Curated annotation (Swiss-Prot):
Molecular function (Gene Ontology), one example: 3-isopropylmalate dehydratase activity
Keywords associated with the record: Amino-acid biosynthesis, Branched-chain amino acid biosynthesis, Leucine biosynthesis, Lyase
Protein name: 3-isopropylmalate dehydratase small subunit 1
Catalyzed reactions: (2R,3S)-3-isopropylmalate = (2S)-2-isopropylmalate
EC number: 4.2.1.33
Xref: PANTHER family: 3-ISOPROPYLMALATE DEHYDRATASE SMALL SUBUNIT 1, 3-ISOPROPYLMALATE DEHYDRATASE SMALL SUBUNIT 2-RELATED-RELATED
Sections of the chain in a coiled coil: none
Keyword Oxidoreductase listed: no
Cytoplasm listed as a keyword: no
Enzyme class name: lyase
Length: 166
C-alpha cells in the first residue's frame, strides 16, 4: 500500500523537464541531480517534495530521450509513485526498472494538488482520502510487482538470478 500527498503536473512532462539538460554534467551524481528534479515544470518541487509524496500528471509523462536517470532521480527525491493519464513507454519501463511504481488512470483531472492518496497496486485501487472518491486501474502485472518489491530490476536479479516468470 502506498500513501502520500499529491504534486500535480500537466500533460507532456518530458525527460528534459524531469532532468534539465543544463545539469547533464551531474548525471553521474544522481543525489545532486535529484536536487533539480522537475524544476523546469515546478520551480521549487525538489526543495518541497517529501518522502512518500505522489506525482499526478496528465498525458504522455516522461516523453523525450531515454534517460534512465530521469525516473531514478524522481525516486531519489522521495516520490513513492507516479499516476498519469499515460506514460511514454520507455519512461514507464525505466521507472519499473528502478523500482518506481507507475499507474495509468484516466481520471487524474479529478485529483488536486495536495490531496492525500492511498494506492493498492496489487488490486488496482486508488483512494483519494481527501475527497473520499475511489478509482480503479488495471493492476500492475505480478511479474512487474515482483520487480517493484525488490526495489528495481537490478536488485531483483541480484536476489533471484533471473527475470521473473511471466
Amino acid at each position: 500500500m502506498i500513501r502520500g500527498r499529491v504534486w500535480k503536473f500537466g500533460d507532456n512532462i518530458s525527460t528534459d523537464h524531469i532532468a534539465p539538460g543544463r545539469y547533464f554534467h551531474l548525471r553521474n551524481n544522481l543525489e545532486e541531480l535529484a536536487k533539480h528534479v522537475l524544476e523546469d515544470a515546478m520551480e521549487d518541487f525538489a526543495k518541497k517534495v517529501q518522502k512518500g509524496d505522489i506525482i499526478v500528471a496528465g498525458k504522455n509523462f516522461g516523453l523525450g530521450s531515454s534517460r534512465e536517470h530521469a525516473a531514478r532521480i524522481i525516486k531519489i527525491a522521495g516520490v513513492s509513485c507516479i499516476v498519469a493519464k499515460s506514460f511514454a513507454r520507455i519512461f514507464y519501463r525505466n521507472a519499473i526498472n528502478v523500482g518506481l511504481p507507475v499507474i495509468e488512470l484516466k481520471e487524474v483531472d479529478e485529483i488536486n494538488q495536495g490531496d492525500e492518496l492511498e494506492i493498492d497496486l496489487e488490486n488496482g485501487v486508488l483512494k483519494n482520502l481527501t475527497t473520499g472518491k475511489e478509482y480503479r486501474f488495471t493492476p500492475i502485472p505480478k511479474f512487474l510487482l515482483e520487480i517493484l518489491k525488490e526495489d528495481g530490476i537490478v536488485n531483483y536479479l541480484k536476489k533471484h538470478g533471473s527475470f521473473p516468470k511471466v
